[in-house]
Amino acid sequence: MHQVKSFLLLAIDGEKMVVVNVGSCIGCRRCERSCPINGITFNEFPIKCMHCDRNPCLYACPENAIERINNKVVVIKDKCVGCGLCALACPFGAIRIDGVAIKCNGCYKRDVEICKEVCPTGAINNLEEILNNKIQNTVNKFNKLYYLYANAK
């Protein structure tokens, strides 16, 4: 029988995708408690901003209180009036209003996300690292790596 591993996409920033291995998440909520801006909502698994390329929250904000900084979508709290239009526009439900908009800022001032650092099971990881490890394991196992190219016409 094959073990099914499911991953939940947490954030996209153009360079990195942060994912949660739902099968490894033990629900300890360390990611939620460690977030300095309370940007993670935890139901059965953590829910964070996807930092999507289209930024519907950014365009919905009438006060220009949401900006893209270092490929992360960030709320500028001094500009936010808490109208909630960004939360309505977010397709992932990752923004909540508590006087002002609160969402994951992707730890844009850090090299590594805090939630990833504190996860005791390693359930939070960068997709690039996961894929690189899988590729390396395949190369090590078969000692060869084959590529299939499509004929583009």
Curated annotation (Swiss-Prot):
One of its GO terms (molecular function) is oxidoreductase activity. Pfam families: Fer4, Fer4_11. [4Fe-4S] cluster 1 binds at residues 25, 28, 31, 119. [4Fe-4S] cluster 4 binds at residues 61, 80, 83, 86. Its cofactor is [4Fe-4S] cluster. [4Fe-4S] cluster 2 binds at residues 35, 104, 107, 115. The keyword Electron transport applies. The keyword 4Fe-4S applies. It comes from the Archaea. InterPro entries: 4Fe4S_Fe-S-bd, 4Fe4S_Fe_S_CS, RnfB_subfamily. [4Fe-4S] cluster 3 binds at residues 49, 52, 57, 90. Keywords: 4Fe-4S, Electron transport, Iron, Iron-sulfur, Metal-binding, Repeat, Transport. Binds 4 [4Fe-4S] clusters. Residues 16-45, 40-71, 71-100, 95-129 form the 4Fe-4S ferredoxin-type domain. PANTHER family: DIMETHYLSULFOXIDE REDUCTASE CHAIN B, OXIDOREDUCTASE. This is Uncharacterized protein MJ0264. The lineage of its organism: Archaea, Methanobacteriati, Methanobacteriota, Methanomada group, Methanococci.
